[in-house]
């Protein structure tokens, strides 16, 4: 759309980013509005930037859960926990393809339920069926952990 309407060059990066290097300033607002309306990330404060999620069941034979939808349900939590960078990795399996680095919180899917690990990678996880949480329980556990961490930081400042 943009390249056709504006005659601009458009590049798609391996990181799923679209670069429009030669947009005329007078067209920037209209282009931004178009991409916003189509649910692209156009603001560096967008809460979706605080999460990493694999394609899940709809895109991977190993995935058993709709990880992207679950990640979107948790994105505001992730942004509250960490103002910049990735705070939450939602992985469809123990491979952890969406993020290889350690993340403050990682949820690893197992048929609609999640293992929760802290400050490690999905590949570091030791599975334990007794700890598997549904999305609501995972959200509640994450919120509790974040509140407790905030209290600890407050006590350390005193």
Range-by-range predicted roles:
Residues 101, 106-158:
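Mobile "lid/hinge" segments at catalytic clefts and subdomain interfaces of large enzymes
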Residues 1-111, 115:
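Small-residue-enriched alpha-helical segments and adjacent helix-cap loops
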């Amino acid at each position: 759309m943009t390249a056709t309407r504006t005659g601009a060059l458009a590049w798609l990066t391996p990181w799923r980013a679209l670069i429009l290097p030669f947009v005329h300033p007078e067209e920037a607002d209209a282009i931004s509005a178009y991409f916003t309306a189509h649910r692209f990330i156009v603001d560096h404060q967008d809460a979706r930037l605080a999460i990493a999620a694999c394609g899940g069941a709809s895109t991977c034979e190993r995935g058993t859960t709709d990880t992207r939808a679950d990640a979107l349900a948790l994105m505001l939590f992730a942004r509250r926990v960490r103002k910049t960078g990735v705070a939450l990795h939602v992985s469809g399996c123990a491979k952890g393809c969406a993020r290889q680095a350690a993340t403050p919180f990682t949820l690893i899917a197992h048929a609609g339920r999640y293992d929760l690990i802290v400050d490690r990678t999905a590949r570091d996880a030791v599975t334990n069926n007794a700890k598997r949480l549904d999305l609501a329980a995972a959200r509640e556990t994450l919120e509790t952990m974040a509140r407790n961490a905030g209290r600890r930081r407050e006590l350390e400042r005193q």
